[in-house]
From Swiss-Prot:
Disulfide bonds: none annotated. The gene is RpL17. This is Large ribosomal subunit protein uL22. It comes from Aedes aegypti. GO terms for cellular component: cytosolic large ribosomal subunit. The keyword ATP-binding does not apply. The keyword Translocase does not apply. Residues 160-186 are annotated as: Disordered. Pfam families: Ribosomal_L22.
Length: 186
């Protein structure tokens, strides 16, 4: 078992899964993984299935050169998006694996959240393509390593309201004016 980039804060309430040297594009997978980060497990699975069916798009934020625009990206406050089906399928398999690990450890599957997900480049695989005039060009693939951890979300406890009303926050300019008024009155 290898070392993960980020260990969970509470190992008893979390589970992990990873895949190495996966034959899926690094750039597409990185953008897809970033989209599901901090999502609840069920929502992340539904999102990835919708991406495969082209009902929701993945926003492309960093690797967006030459990527076309789509209306579905408005949901993410951007205009650039795609539907990387193969990346979504690989991530779905990893989420399924992590869910099985959580079930084995006795965690509540409905309260799991994607706490950490990271995509790293794997060594490129080299093939060749034949060109005109007897030349040969490289035909590379960019596989990746994926690791993720799911954490059981804790109950949110609301803070008790105090009897004192909250003080209104004043800007520096208004505070200065109040001080000047007090100085004039004295």
């Amino acid at each position: 078992m290898g070392r993960y980039a980020k260990e969970p804060d509470n190992p008893a309430k979390s589970c992990k899964a990873r895949g190495s040297n996966l034959r899926v594009h690094f750039k597409n997978t990185r953008e897809t993984a970033l989209a599901i980060k901090r999502m609840p497990l069920r929502r992340a699975q539904k999102f990835l299935k919708n991406v495969c069916e082209k009902k929701e798009c993945v926003p492309f934020r960093r690797f967006n050169g030459g990527v076309g625009r789509c209306a579905q990206a408005k949901h993410w406050n951007t205009s650039v998006g795609r539907w990387p089906k193969k990346s979504a399928e690989f991530l779905l398999q990893l989420l399924k694996n992590a869910e099985a690990n959580a079930d084995y450890r006795g965690l509540d599957v409905d309260r799991l959240v994607v706490d950490h997900i990271q995509v790293n480049r794997a060594p490129c695989l080299r093939r060749r393509t034949y060109r005109a005039h007897g030349r040969i060009n490289p035909y590379m693939s960019s596989p990746c390593h994926i690791e993720l951890s799911l954490t059981e979300k804790e109950d949110v406890v609301t803070k008790a309201a105090e009897n004192e009303p909250a003080k209104k926050k004043l800007s520096k300019k208004k505070l200065q004016r109040q001080k000047e008024k007090m100085m004039r009155n004295e």
